[in-house]
């Protein structure tokens, strides 16, 4: 919100500098982004009166004699297409500074002396987007009353101070000059002074010319007035200046009045050309599928049933709350104007403007809320301005569909409630003074008082809101700083916290680096690596499609991080993350998703760099599985790895599901080469675990065993197997032999080559046996090996080599 300091002073009698005002506003709840003075950096710019203007043959140039208040006219060569004799212009005399600190000097153009420059607004630093179209390709023409030789700043209000406010959604009341005036008046204990317009109505009633109706629950009220015999022309200079300083391009007096009212009241308005209506009844309804509308910017908009439209003769003529239609726009020939003031549902307007990527000053205000109490006042004010600036005749009364409550909202609390929360010792008299400054009504006493909150402050509805207002006006800097009086409370980590801490420590001990990725991603990535995808939970109003859906897996976000690092030549990565995924078993539009803690990691590149002693070693499936084995061993959990080809984004031959108590709790494996290519990453291995399942399976008590003094015995066994037999199947077969003295199974060799028949492989294991209470004998171990050999032969078809 851009606030004119000059305009603000007309509404509130304050005697402070713009800088002091900005600082005070920032400390009381409305942040000031900065202050801009349009004239800053400009100098020696004066009013000039073009006495004569002669075309220079065979050029686009004009030789002008300009009165700049000096004894003799000043000769200036100008190339602007709209320069002519008799107009008042902006002249930069030699030594002047214009935009970009450019200095004007005497010079010669085509051999003709030029003692200055006739300037356009662009050359003064104004943006093309706010300059009136009639002057966008030429010089600015000043009002006839401008005096030659005077500094031009006061005529264009370039000496104003423009205060830029950063308005948070809860303070949308400050998206209007009246709202800002109320705020400033409360800060300084002043009163507001709003000008009144003398509206004179004709004998003809508005209801004779127009009728309005509402056919949607998303329209709270819709009101109109009619102004006849309007003369469309450029707005007076003061109004154009005000709009340009607010970042709005002046169009004509009718459109400019609606924009002025928007800035002044915060009430969006629209003006229709009544003579372009095919009917005299306006109906506001939801658009129908397949309908379209050409908006004022010339774009054809395809509408949906979620859009609101203003219709005449059942045809859309405006996109409600967003932008008017081209078919009924005001032009130079318009004579009868229909003014619209309405309140539309903010969510509906936000959805339409977001879908069409069509943001406007009007849609912004409807999205955040408007003051119900001034809808009709703003409508009357606009009609009175058209009467004044366009010489229009205002029909009596207005037509309205839908009623709004304009009564103050009553909120009750007590003095103790306020002081306890602020740590203050305010008296009831202090409370009365503060709410009087705010312009709020107050009844009751310190034991119970009720505040009547005007409709202009629709952000206040509960006692906590009153406390905030008291703190703001009293002064945040005056609130006492106290330390909590309560003593420390002994506590311990919850099981969830303890598990997270332990897993984090193990992961970092294994060389993984923690990252935090976005919980919001694209709908496609949200379910990409999910073992059991559920209903997708999507945001209704995402900032972008890249952050529009809640993730159902951790891996896709981690791969984004891998891709980011790989693109910057960092390809040896070992990352982990502990975070939440979001599962939705029911309707995501009606119920919140379940939040489940997950642990995931990813590794890629080299696990060992090449040097004079070591060969380079790339990560593989077993490195990823080794990380998990270490994790499960430290958690005292026993899992199974089951090969799977069902995960579309994982390599079908290098991926396994992880089972705990016969339940799938995660997966580990290589990212599918196609998926890796889509992410622009090298060969990458990932794993993801359900930490809630891990927590549920953790043993409640930790059992300690005495370290035995008896030695262990080791036996090696080499097996000839079919290539399809997995390591997990072999381990399962060995364990099924039921040898309770078997304490460790270690695979130490895998071989496939010329000495092994086709379709076969050799796997060698080291088996460790130990009796904690006695020495083992060779005979005992031999019996154990016979049992194990039998189990391997029967279950996996192994042949002992």
UniProtKB/Swiss-Prot annotation:
One matching Pfam family: B3_4
Domain of life: Bacteria
Subunit (UniProt): Tetramer of two alpha and two beta subunits.
The reaction(s) this protein catalyses: tRNA(Phe) + L-phenylalanine + ATP = L-phenylalanyl-tRNA(Phe) + AMP + diphosphate + H(+)
Binding site for Mg(2+): 459, 465, 468-469
SUPFAM superfamilies per record: Anticodon-binding domain of PheRS, Class II aaRS and biotin synthetases, Nucleic acid-binding proteins, PheT/TilS domain, Putative DNA-binding domain
Disulfide bridges in this chain: none
Family stated for the protein in its record: Belongs to the phenylalanyl-tRNA synthetase beta subunit family. Type 1 subfamily.
Annotated localization: Cytoplasm
Xref: InterPro entries: aa-tRNA-synth_II/BPL/LPL, B3/B4_tRNA-bd, DNA-bd_dom_put_sf, Fdx_antiC-bd, Fdx_antiC-bd_sf, NA-bd_OB-fold, Phe-tRNA-ligase_IIc_bsu, Phe-tRNA-ligase_IIc_bsu_bact
Organism this protein belongs to: Streptococcus pyogenes serotype M3 (strain ATCC BAA-595 / MGAS315)
Enzyme type, top EC level: ligase
Enzyme Commission designation: 6.1.1.20
Domain B5: start-end pairs: 406-481
SMART domains the record matches: B3_4, B5, FDX-ACB
Molecular function terms, GO-annotated: ATP binding; catalytic activity, acting on a protein; magnesium ion binding; phenylalanine-tRNA ligase activity; transferase activity; tRNA binding
Cofactor, free-text remark: Binds 2 magnesium ions per tetramer.
One record GO biological process: phenylalanyl-tRNA aminoacylation
Protein name: Phenylalanine--tRNA ligase beta subunit
């Amino acid at each position: 919100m851009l606030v004119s300091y000059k305009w603000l002073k007309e509404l509130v009698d304050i005697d402070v500098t713009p800088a002091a005002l900005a600082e005070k506003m920032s400390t009381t709840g409305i942040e000031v982004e900065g202050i801009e003075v349009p004239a800053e950096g400009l100098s020696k710019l004066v009013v000039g009166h073009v006495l004569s203007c002669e075309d220079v043959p065979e050029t686009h140039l004009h030789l002008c004699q300009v009165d700049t208040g000096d004894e003799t006219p000043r000769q200036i060569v100008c190339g602007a297409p709209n320069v002519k004799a008799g107009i008042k212009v902006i002249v930069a005399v030699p030594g002047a500074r214009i935009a970009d600190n450019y200095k004007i000097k005497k010079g010669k153009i085509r051999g003709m002396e030029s003692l200055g420059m006739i300037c356009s607004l662009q050359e003064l630093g104004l943006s093309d987007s706010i300059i009136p179209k009639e002057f966008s390709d030429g010089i600015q023409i000043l009002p006839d009353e401008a005096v030659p030789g005077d500094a031009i700043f006061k005529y264009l209000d370039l000496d104003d101070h423009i205060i830029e406010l950063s308005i948070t959604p809860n303070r949308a009341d400050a998206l209007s000059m009246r709202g800002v005036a109320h705020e400033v008046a409360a800060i300084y204990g002043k009163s507001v002074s709003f000008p009144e317009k003398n509206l004179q109505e004709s004998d003809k009633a508005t209801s004779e010319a127009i009728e309005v109706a509402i056919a949607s629950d998303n329209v709270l009220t819709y009101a109109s007035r009619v102004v006849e015999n309007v003369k469309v022309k450029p707005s007076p200079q003061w109004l154009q200046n005000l709009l340009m300083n607010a970042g709005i391009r002046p169009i004509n007096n009718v459109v400019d009045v609606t924009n002025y009212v928007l800035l002044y009241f915060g009430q969006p308005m629209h003006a229709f050309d009544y003579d372009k209506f095919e009917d005299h009844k306006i109906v506001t309804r939801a658009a129908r599928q397949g309908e379209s509308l050409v908006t004022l910017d010339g774009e054809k908009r395809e509408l949906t049933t979620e859009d609101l439209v203003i219709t005449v003769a059942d045809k859309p003529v405006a996109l409600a709350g967003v932008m008017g239609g081209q078919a009924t726009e005001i032009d130079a020939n318009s004579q009868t104007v229909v003014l619209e003031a309405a309140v539309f549902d903010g969510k509906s307007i936000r959805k339409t403007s977001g879908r069409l990527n069509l943001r406007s000053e009007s849609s912004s205000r409807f999205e955040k809320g408007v003051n119900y109490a001034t809808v009709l006042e703003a409508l009357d004010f606009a009609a009175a301005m058209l009467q004044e600036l366009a010489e229009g005749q205002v029909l009596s009364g207005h037509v309205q569909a839908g009623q709004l409550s304009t009564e103050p909202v009553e909120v009750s609390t007590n003095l103790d409630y306020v002081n306890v929360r602020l740590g203050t010792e305010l008296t009831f008299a202090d409370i009365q003074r503060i709410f009087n400054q705010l312009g709020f009504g107050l009844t009751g006493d310190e034991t119970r008082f009720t505040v009547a909150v005007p409709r202009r402050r629709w952000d206040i509805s509960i006692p906590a809101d009153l406390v905030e207002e008291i703190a703001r006006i009293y002064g945040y800097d005056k609130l006492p700083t106290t330390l909590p009086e309560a003593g420390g409370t002994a506590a311990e980590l919850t099981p969830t916290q303890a598990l997270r801490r332990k897993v984090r420590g193990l992961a970092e001990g294994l060389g993984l680096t923690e990252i935090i990725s976005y919980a919001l991603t694209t709908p496609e990535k949200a379910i990409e690596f999910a073992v059991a995808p559920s209903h997708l939970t999507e945001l209704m109003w995402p900032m972008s499609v890249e952050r529009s859906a809640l993730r159902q897996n951790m891996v896709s976000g981690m791969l984004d991080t891998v891709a980011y690092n790989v693109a910057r030549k960092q390809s040896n990565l070992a990352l982990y993350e502990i975070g939440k995924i979001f599962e939705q078993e029911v309707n995501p539009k009606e119920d919140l998703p379940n939040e489940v803690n997950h642990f995931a990691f990813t590794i890629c590149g080299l696990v060992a760099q090449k040097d004079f002693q070591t060969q380079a070693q790339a990560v593989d499936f077993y490195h990823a599985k080794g990380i998990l084995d270490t994790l499960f061993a430290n958690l005292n959990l026993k899992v199974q790895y089951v090969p799977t080809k069902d995960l579309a984004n994982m390599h079908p031959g290098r991926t396994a599901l992880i089972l705990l108590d016969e339940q799938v709790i995660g997966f580990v494996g290589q990212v599918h080469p196609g998926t890796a290519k889509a992410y622009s990453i090298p060969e990458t291995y990932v794993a993801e675990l359900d930490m809630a399942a891990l927590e549920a399976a953790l043993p409640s008590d930790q059992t300690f065993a005495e370290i035995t003094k008896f030695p262990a015995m080791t036996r090696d066994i080499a097996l000839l197997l079919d290539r399809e037999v997995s390591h997990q199947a072999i381990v399962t077969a060995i364990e099924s032999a039921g040898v309770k003295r078997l304490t460790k199974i270690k695979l130490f060799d895998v071989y496939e080559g010329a000495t092994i028949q086709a379709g076969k492989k050799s796997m060698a294991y080291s088996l460790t046996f130990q009796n904690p209470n006695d020495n083992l004998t060779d005979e005992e171990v031999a019996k154990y090996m016979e049992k194990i050999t039998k189990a391997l032969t029967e279950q996996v078809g192994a042949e002992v080599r």
